[in-house]
Amino acid sequence: MQWDDSAQAGFTTGTPWLFVNPNYKEINVKEQLGREDSVWYYYQKLIALRKSEDYKEVFTYGKVVPMFVEKDGIFAYARKTEDQTVYIITNYSREDITVDLLTTNEQPKLHVLLDNKNDVCLNGNRIRLSSGQAVILG
């Protein structure tokens, strides 16, 4: 674990048996804790969403329904209970991608619950994701 930007990335004061990655000055826990838009804080928000009273039932017991399996560059699925549906959509391609949630045969009223880039483009039931973007809608 790269804890900070000190010698040996703050892991040890001794000699480590594995080399420390040269990026430890830029990528470390201390740096992540200093930025609200860091991966560390994103995972904190993700965990809080999963544990929230409003969504813990659907995230824990909801049926997993794959979505857009024919579309390259997208990994997406819905979690569904009788009363609730959340959509998890990620774009792992190098290009922006637009998907239409009406193809799910539902007409959801969507709200952004979590977005790793904080710039999701949601227009009715159409959503545009930039490269590397992940969003949870509910």
Which sequence ranges carry the predicted segments?
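Intrinsic disorder/low-complexity detector
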Residues: 7, 93, 102, 117-121
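Solvent-exposed beta-strand/loop surfaces of large extracellular or lumenal domains
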Residues: 111-125
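C-terminal beta-strand-rich structural cap/linker in extracellular carbohydrate-active enzymes
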Residues: 121-138
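Beta-strand-rich binding/interaction modules
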Residues: 96-115
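A generic structural signal for short, non-catalytic loop/turn and secondary-structure boundary residues
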Residues: 70, 92, 103-106, 129-130
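Loop/helix patches that line or flank the sugar-binding groove of alpha-linked glycan CAZymes
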Residues: 1-97
